[in-house]
Swiss-Prot record:
Alphabetized InterPro entries for the sequence: Kinase-like_dom_sf (IPR011009), Leu-rich_rpt (IPR001611), Leu-rich_rpt_typical-subtyp (IPR003591), LRR-RLK (IPR052592), LRR_dom_sf (IPR032675), LRR_N_plant-typ (IPR013210), Prot_kinase_dom (IPR000719), Protein_kinase_ATP_BS (IPR017441)
Transmembrane segment boundaries: 784-804
Membrane topology: Single-pass type I membrane protein
Protein name, UniProt field: Probable leucine-rich repeat receptor-like protein kinase At1g35710
Active site: 981 (proton acceptor)
Source organism of this protein record: Arabidopsis thaliana
Cytoplasmic side: 805-1120
Modification Phosphotyrosine occurs at: 929, 968, 1022, 1029
Subcellular location: Membrane
Leader peptide range in chain numbering: 1-29
Keyword Glycoprotein assigned: yes
Amino acid sequence: MGFAEKNLYDFRFLLFISIILSCSISASATIAEANALLKWKSTFTNSSKLSSWVHDANTNTSFSCTSWYGVSCNSRGSIEELNLTNTGIEGTFQDFPFISLSNLAYVDLSMNLLSGTIPPQFGNLSKLIYFDLSTNHLTGEISPSLGNLKNLTVLYLHQNYLTSVIPSELGNMESMTDLALSQNKLTGSIPSSLGNLKNLMVLYLYENYLTGVIPPELGNMESMTDLALSQNKLTGSIPSTLGNLKNLMVLYLYENYLTGVIPPEIGNMESMTNLALSQNKLTGSIPSSLGNLKNLTLLSLFQNYLTGGIPPKLGNIESMIDLELSNNKLTGSIPSSLGNLKNLTILYLYENYLTGVIPPELGNMESMIDLQLNNNKLTGSIPSSFGNLKNLTYLYLYLNYLTGVIPQELGNMESMINLDLSQNKLTGSVPDSFGNFTKLESLYLRVNHLSGAIPPGVANSSHLTTLILDTNNFTGFFPETVCKGRKLQNISLDYNHLEGPIPKSLRDCKSLIRARFLGNKFTGDIFEAFGIYPDLNFIDFSHNKFHGEISSNWEKSPKLGALIMSNNNITGAIPTEIWNMTQLVELDLSTNNLFGELPEAIGNLTNLSRLRLNGNQLSGRVPAGLSFLTNLESLDLSSNNFSSEIPQTFDSFLKLHDMNLSRNKFDGSIPRLSKLTQLTQLDLSHNQLDGEIPSQLSSLQSLDKLDLSHNNLSGLIPTTFEGMIALTNVDISNNKLEGPLPDTPTFRKATADALEENIGLCSNIPKQRLKPCRELKKPKKNGNLVVWILVPILGVLVILSICANTFTYCIRKRKLQNGRNTDPETGENMSIFSVDGKFKYQDIIESTNEFDPTHLIGTGGYSKVYRANLQDTIIAVKRLHDTIDEEISKPVVKQEFLNEVKALTEIRHRNVVKLFGFCSHRRHTFLIYEYMEKGSLNKLLANDEEAKRLTWTKRINVVKGVAHALSYMHHDRITPIVHRDISSGNILLDNDYTAKISDFGTAKLLKTDSSNWSAVAGTYGYVAPEFAYTMKVTEKCDVYSFGVLILELIIGKHPGDLVSSLSSSPGEALSLRSISDERVLEPRGQNREKLLKMVEMALLCLQANPESRPTMLSISTTFS
């Protein structure tokens, strides 16, 4: 064998050996990988779809990749792909074979039940190209080690429960094209290093808790096509660098806290198809450059603070399908160019300040499905061209100022499902063409000036669920076929002039949930007019002309919560079945001709909050069972024939606000009602009550109106009535009362009519036409026995009078000395006045550590407020600034100031912060107030957590409390007091969230930056507009400020520019949904109704003409 032949032989032998070895190693590797996977599988709770994963671990035979579900191998037999998406596996990565599967390039474990953390060892799989763990239950952090995967192109971790921050190391994955971390619980900021990912096309970070700004470096990702950062907590402005992303097609930044303007550079992104910046805090105008985005199909900018007009250039984007600009502050008219958008299906411009007419060109948008222009200031008529919109299913034009008739052409919109034209000024009749709406589900025409008969065609649709036609001038009979489709749920016909019987189809309309017929001329037998309604929860057919007896079938409507049939001609006894309707919350049968007695079974209605049976012929005793209705808030049994005593158990109505038992035949004494601490109105007049007025009535600290007139009450009026600080209206006439009136503003202002026919009452106020209290009765003649009795008594009285005068002189002298006291340390004089003398100067100085900053709780324009912990109480001490102190030290000013402060200490109202006293010293001058634990309203509203605790119920009570306090100060004082500075900073709350006004009257006293103290009044943003030119402060200035305060409570912050626009436009329409504080759950039920009433009141208060504003008395009465 030659040398060459020998070498060739050796080479072939070595090659053969290497192939044998290679095959052996490969086989060993695949077996090891298989065994490793089987070990991981054994940890799964559920692995039914992996039944093909079978291998005998005791043999060395290889396994076939193709036979294992979801497993693929490379050419050498090593596992490189693991695709187990949606296989239902439930387990963790604790035993995942990272070392054995080092060749993995593709991993898809999405849509399973994997839990636990993502191990950092995944960062060692250097060949990984595709990695998807989305839609699992994974927790913990995203490991920074993933940044080592230089070849990774796709990373999907979305829809898990991952926390912590996004690692900046992810910016090292230079091959990355798709990165989805959305729908987790990630926090922290977006790493600027992501801007290094030049190949990144898709970045999804939406639905997390990310904060901070959007990094400008994201504008470097030139390959980007989809960028979604929505539904986070991002702040700051939108970087103008995003305009560099020429390939970007989708930009979602909605539902963040972004501020600033929309960068005009966004108009450079010519590939853009979907742009959503809605639900942020963006300001400024809509850039006209957006009109350059020729491929745009979606433009969503709603719920921001955008101003200015709608750019006409938007009408050039012919590809536009969805345009949403609602809930902003846009002004001007709707551009007619929008009519060019032939492909537009959705146009939302609602809740702005748009004016002018609706362009007829909008009728050219043939693809339109949903058109909402409501809550604006649009005028003119509804364009007849809307009849061309054959595909339109939703048309909302409500809350505008539209006039004229409803065009017949609207009936051509045969696809219509929901039509709302309510709260405009439309006239004429409802077009007959509405009968073409065969798909109609909801029709709202309420609060217009529509008249004539309601056409039968309105009820043609078998899909009709909601028909709201109230507050118009409709006449005639109502269409018989109203419930033709048996789907009608909500019908409201109230406040029209409809007549005749209720349609028979309504009697059998089992689908009804809510029905209102009040304020019409409907007739017929009430027993036959209505049927049985399984789902009905509210019905009101009051103020009509129904007759007959109440049907017992109402018991068979198991969900009925409110049954209201007042002011009809209903007769007979109340059926016993009514008392079995335990779900009732409101029962109003008032002003009919019902008779009979109330049974004990009335106590079954334990959910009842409002019971009105007044104006009937009911008789007998009031049953004791009534006292079981502990949820009652309003009770009216007046104008009946009830007799016997008022039950003593009435003190169980702890939630009761008003009770009227007047015009009956009740006798006996007034029961003890001391537990009814929420009672605001009590009317027991026109009965046969006798005995004395119980002193316990003075416990009713919320009582605002008390009428005890036309009874047989005798004796003195309890002196404890002087503590009833909320009482503003009293009538005790036509009784047998005697003695002096209580010394309160309410009794001093009481009219002669409210006091007359009480022969023993006395008063020194001439207008009350009572005998003077100083008058003594002369003894009758020949009264020797009387003389012998009276002389010793009068002698004793004279001696006692002398002693009393002497004692009073001493006390006054001590108080005078207290008024000019001496500092125990310096011997210097100081002036101190305290209403009860219990606050000592030295105690206050010591408790505040001589006004150390650690005790500071607030700072104002003229003072600092400190908390002082005294031995038995906590007080607030308002220390005046030195400039104020110097002004007050002037003799003339000081005396006037002291007189005013002393007057203010006499104020007693539960919604006014109590001023205890005042101290003037060379070193310190301060006022002493009661301490309010929750602090000021503005601080609560500025704190998100505190604002959430300030529920709608609490906010409503704040409005009521402030209204009652202002009414008291304006109308119930002998000398009215104007606050001058009503603002959220001057409304304080205690631990129970009871609102009290602070600085009442002191605003005038302490503003001394002008020789005329009236020259400055109020806090910026709350001052009435007329003050700028009159420089006069009146009660109507407080009313204006109160209107601002209402809006502030509803919005959750100062209403800003909205105030001036409402002041200049008294007819302004406001949507509660658009302005209500989003930190509190959306108001519902009674709270929503109360808030709507308060918004209406705020609009009245903000009228530019002060004479057009209501008085605080009328406001307070409305809210009572």
